[in-house]
């Protein structure tokens, strides 16, 4: 613990804290738990939630809750977390427990978990660390697969990207959503005194110090922190899910908290402090899985599959019997009080006596910032081949590249069909889940980020990110109702990193406000930075966002492009090549100006595309982002197993070079496939441009009389779908 913090605590207490109390402060005042560096910045998101009548529970609880159907009072619970450091040290258990923790956040609101997403970042899979990267990929995917499949929650989508900035700090961000009726919601606030505190699950030494471990840079000695990584048990988690929801159905449970970072210390203090009450605990009643555990170890253990319940006095036996039926360890460990203090005894010895406001309100840090915008004017003379004559091989190379190729190697290992609600499966721009309780409504989910854009221009890259996510939702006709953010950055004590954090948050907040989607929760993960031989290796700024949207009628989502369809694009392509996959993969550079997003135009485009989809006028829709028009139209062909003929002569009003026309990642573009009879109506509504037709079994692109692309769809699919296995060193 910082000596200034310790001095402040001593002054406030009027005494020196004991070792147990110091351990509690060290964990709760860690960056991971307290957001000391970012709490002031996160207040910028407040403007996005004002006067939104559908937000039932906003930021601050284990999960946000948004009403999605007035007739049934149905609400969607949504939460997002990271498990970055643990997943680098122990990829299997780090990723598995990341899934377990986010699912418990959802059941903490008495919501049934219905879907998972994951956003993964790894190092350069073709670089010097490729063997380590492959090992990490396998471990993380195995952990997510085994845990998610065994608890019966479908993993319906996400993203996976590679960059050398993640060589020493991979990222594992997980999203979970659930459903609950408004009248059945339970929160994490114990607002009454004399409630009985019941702990579900046994406590061991695994994960001790996990919160403080996640709040510092990794070093070459970090392998020694393996004991800080929690160990998960998916079968126990399944029992915890079912039993907790059953206990809540009694209406005797007044508040719940998952035991995550900092264990009992965090869950109990947050549960009581947020409700304005105190807590009195008896540690001898905590069921232990390891002998001889000290009070400190019990208070900060991060053993998995544990829940803390505050229940009505007199209902203890009824609640305990429910958990015993599932053969879960369960015991009464304390009660809520009117003292607003955290009082803990162990075998009649007082081991903790602290004011909750001091424990739960860490002093905030004021970090210095230094402007760090790396984008430069686009100097095409520095590129070896300013205008390549042959584009077929370039398109194939992009389709095979790590950040564009099919991730079926990953998602086909996940059970995305369990619960039988998945309508649009992984591999598309957005995942779609049917709502049996509110048919014909449906939910759509996305998770997105473009770290390269955010490195070059933190503010502009974050604006672009919001727009891309909303366009992805528009492809299935979904209206965005709530946004989560997972802010992954390097060391905030370094001015360049803090500037990136600040500008990315500004960009996300401004983008969300203009588009009209409230930011209802999220997570901050800092210190994703490694020091080796005195040199810093920070990750690229990676503000991953996940947006949930509602679809009014699931029957109108696009069913797929078909022969004879007309292809329409919603916006022009511009000379904006900075940070594009084309520049990175073909020319090994990230220079240039990143694409600029016009938020008002984007809002109009997504609104009109949503309306057209909901009116049943769109057969297929594909967002143009990574890889530009060339990759987007390729995905349309491969997904629908159809050919396309494009003529971009009339569309190329900016007179762009051929490679820029195909691979620029200009914002605002969605490719639509529509019936011939509806084409004029759609073009007029969107002020879009007709660029071609669905025809044959090849992708043919020309510019007036100049043929740019001519490729068989089967050849494209072979490259696109097999590339990931090849990257992992598997023989095809």
Curated annotation (Swiss-Prot):
UniProt binding sites for substrate: 82-85, 104, 230, 302-304, 525
Gene Ontology MF terms in the entry: ATP binding; magnesium ion binding; phosphoribosylformylglycinamidine synthase activity
Entry GO terms, CC: cytoplasm
Residue numbers annotated as active site: 32, 83
Reaction it catalyzes: N(2)-formyl-N(1)-(5-phospho-beta-D-ribosyl)glycinamide + L-glutamine + ATP + H2O = 2-formamido-N(1)-(5-O-phospho-beta-D-ribosyl)acetamidine + L-glutamate + ADP + phosphate + H(+)
Pfam families xrefs: AIRS (PF00586), AIRS_C (PF02769), FGAR-AT_linker (PF18072)
Pathway in which this enzyme or protein is active: Purine metabolism; IMP biosynthesis via de novo pathway; 5-amino-1-(5-phospho-D-ribosyl)imidazole from N(2)-formyl-N(1)-(5-phospho-D-ribosyl)glycinamide: step 1/2
EC numbers on record: 6.3.5.3
Residues reported in the UniProt entry to bind Mg(2+) 2: 105, 258
Any one GO biological process: 'de novo' IMP biosynthetic process
Binding site for Mg(2+) 1: 81, 523
SUPFAM superfamilies: PurM C-terminal domain-like (SSF56042), PurM N-terminal domain-like (SSF55326)
Subcellular location: Cytoplasm
Signal peptide: none
Highest taxon above the source species: Archaea
Residue positions binding ATP: 35, 485, 522
Alphabetized UniProt keyword annotations: ATP-binding, Cytoplasm, Ligase, Magnesium, Metal-binding, Nucleotide-binding, Purine biosynthesis
Family per similarity comment: Belongs to the FGAMS family.
Subunit text: Monomer. Part of the FGAM synthase complex composed of 1 PurL, 1 PurQ and 2 PurS subunits.
UniProt function note: Part of the phosphoribosylformylglycinamidine synthase complex involved in the purines biosynthetic pathway. Catalyzes the ATP-dependent conversion of formylglycinamide ribonucleotide (FGAR) and glutamine to yield formylglycinamidine ribonucleotide (FGAM) and glutamate. The FGAM synthase complex is composed of three subunits. PurQ produces an ammonia molecule by converting glutamine to glutamate. PurL transfers the ammonia molecule to FGAR to form FGAM in an ATP-dependent manner.
Protein name: Phosphoribosylformylglycinamidine synthase subunit PurL
């Amino acid at each position: 613990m910082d000596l200034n913090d310790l001095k402040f605590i001593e002054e406030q207490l009027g005494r020196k804290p004991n070792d147990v109390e110091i351990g509690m402060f060290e964990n709760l005042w860690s960056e991971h738990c307290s957001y000391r560096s970012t709490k002031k910045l996160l207040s910028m998101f407040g403007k996005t939630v004002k006067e939104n009548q559908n937000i039932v529970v906003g930021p601050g609880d284990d999960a946000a809750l948004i009403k999605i159907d007035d007739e049934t009072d149905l609400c969607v619970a949504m939460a997002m977390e990271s498990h970055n450091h643990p997943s680098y040290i122990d990829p299997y258990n780090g990723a598995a427990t990341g899934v377990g923790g986010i699912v418990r956040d959802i059941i903490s609101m008495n919501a049934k978990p219905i879907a998972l997403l994951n956003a993964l970042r790894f190092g350069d899979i073709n670089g010097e660390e490729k063997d380590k990267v492959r090992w990490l990929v396998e471990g993380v995917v195995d952990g997510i697969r085994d845990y998610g499949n065994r608890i019966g929650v479908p993993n319906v989508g996400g993203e996976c990207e590679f960059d050398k900035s993640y060589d020493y700090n991979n990222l594992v961000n997980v999203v979970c959503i659930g459903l609950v009726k408004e009248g059945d919601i339970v929160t994490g606030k114990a607002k009454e005194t004399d409630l009985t505190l019941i702990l579900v699950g046994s406590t061991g030494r695994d994960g001790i110090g996990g919160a403080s471990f996640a709040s510092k840079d990794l070093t070459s000695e970090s392998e020694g922190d393996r004991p800080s990584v929690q160990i998960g048990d998916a079968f126990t988690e399944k029992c915890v899910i079912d039993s907790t929801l059953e206990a809540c159905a009694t209406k005797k449970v007044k508040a719940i908290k998952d035991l995550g970072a900092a264990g009992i210390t965090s869950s109990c203090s947050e549960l009581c402090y947020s409700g304005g009450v105190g807590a009195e605990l008896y540690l001898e009643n905590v069921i232990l899985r390891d002998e001889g555990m000290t009070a400190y170890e019990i208070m900060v253990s991060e053993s998995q599959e544990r829940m803390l319940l505050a229940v009505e006095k007199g209902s203890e036996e009824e609640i305990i019997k429910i958990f015993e039926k599932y053969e879960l360890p369960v015991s009464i460990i304390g009660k809520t009080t009117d003292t607003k203090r955290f009082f803990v005894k162990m075998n009649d010895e007082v081991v903790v006596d602290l004011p909750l406001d001091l424990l739960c309100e860490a002093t905030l840090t004021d970090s210095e910032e230094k402007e760090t915008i790396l984008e430069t004017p686009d100097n095409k003379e520095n590129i070896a081949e300013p205008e390549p004559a042959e584009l077929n091989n370039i398109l194939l190379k992009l389709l095979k590249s790590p950040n564009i190729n099919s991730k079926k190697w990953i998602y086909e290992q996940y059970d995305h069909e369990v619960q039988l609600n998945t309508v649009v499966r992984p591999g598309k721009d957005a995942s779609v889940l049917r709502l049996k309780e509110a048919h014909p409504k449906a939910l759509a989910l996305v998770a997105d980020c473009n770290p390269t854009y955010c490195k070059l221009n933190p503010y502009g890259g974050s604006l672009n990110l919001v727009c891309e996510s909303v366009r992805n939702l528009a492809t299935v006709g979904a209206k965005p109702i709530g946004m989560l953010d997972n802010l992954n950055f390097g060391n905030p004590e370094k001015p360049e990193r803090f500037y990136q954090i600040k500008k990315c948050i500004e960009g996300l907040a401004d983008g969300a406000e203009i588009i009209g989607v409230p930011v209802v929760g999220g997570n901050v993960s800092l210190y994703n930075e490694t020091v080796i031989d005195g040199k810093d290796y920070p990750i690229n700024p990676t503000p991953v966002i996940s947006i949930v949207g509602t679809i009014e009628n699931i029957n109108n989502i696009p069913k797929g492009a078909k022969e004879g369809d007309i292809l329409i694009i919603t916006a022009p392509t511009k000379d904006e090549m900075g940070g594009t996959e084309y520049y990175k993969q073909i020319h090994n550079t990230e220079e240039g100006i990143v694409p600029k997003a016009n938020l008002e135009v984007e809002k109009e485009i997504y609104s009109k595309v949503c309306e057209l989809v909901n009116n049943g006028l769109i057969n297929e829709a594909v967002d143009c982002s990574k890889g530009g028009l060339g990759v987007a139209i390729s995905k349309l062909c491969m997904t629908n197993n159809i050919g396309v003929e494009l003529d971009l002569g009339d569309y190329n009003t900016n007179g762009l070079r051929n490679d820029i026309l195909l691979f620029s990642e200009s914002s605002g573009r969605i490719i639509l496939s529509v019936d011939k009879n509806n084409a004029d109506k759609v073009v007029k509504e969107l002020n879009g441009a007709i660029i071609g037709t669905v025809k044959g079994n090849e992708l043919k692109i020309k510019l007036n009389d100049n043929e740019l692309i001519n490729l068989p769809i089967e050849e494209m699919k072979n490259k696109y779908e097999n590339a990931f296995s090849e990257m992992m060193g598997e023989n095809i």
